Amino acid sequence: VDRFYRHDPTSTGPEIMAWCEWQYYKNYGDKDRLRKVYYPLLSFHHWLKNYHRWKDGSYWSSGWGCGMDNLPRCDLELIPDSEDWQLETFHHSYMSWIDATLQAAMSCEYLIMMAEELGITDDVDALRDEYDNLIRFVNEKMWSEKDGFYYDLKADGSFLAVKTVAAFWALIAKIAPPD
């Protein structure tokens, strides 16, 4: 059953709408629509940046929030009062989430392309800086050279050593180094 509760972080889905709208624009060339959606998408990005981002710049989500609630990525031992099995699906587990972080980077990239297409210059530098910082963070902190894989990070900076499909967002975002 889908659910929505105001101010509940599990009620916020993944940040993929800028990507979707850019694909729509590339297929149909509807610049009026692009102009209408740009600022709401930018506002959503800023909202997530303010409320779903850790101090190191990485992003978090939850099982329901990321849409992949069946992944074994939440460590119940890190969650206070975790006797409730549902917390595994609903809690962010104090982690930096690889998919949420890469989706934020992709959103920056697509918002930049939209802004350039629309002749908007105000936000481009800040978005480009965030994009560069996120990509650097992901490749420096979330990549395991030993395993050749991207991982979520625990609060202490160590890898959550569970391989999940969330790492494949690095391929979708086209940020994985060629080697």
Question: Model regions: which residues?
Answer:
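Active-site acid/base region of carbohydrate-active enzymes
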Residues: 28-98, 133, 143-146
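Short, conserved alpha-helical segments within structured domains
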Residues: 13, 37, 127-130
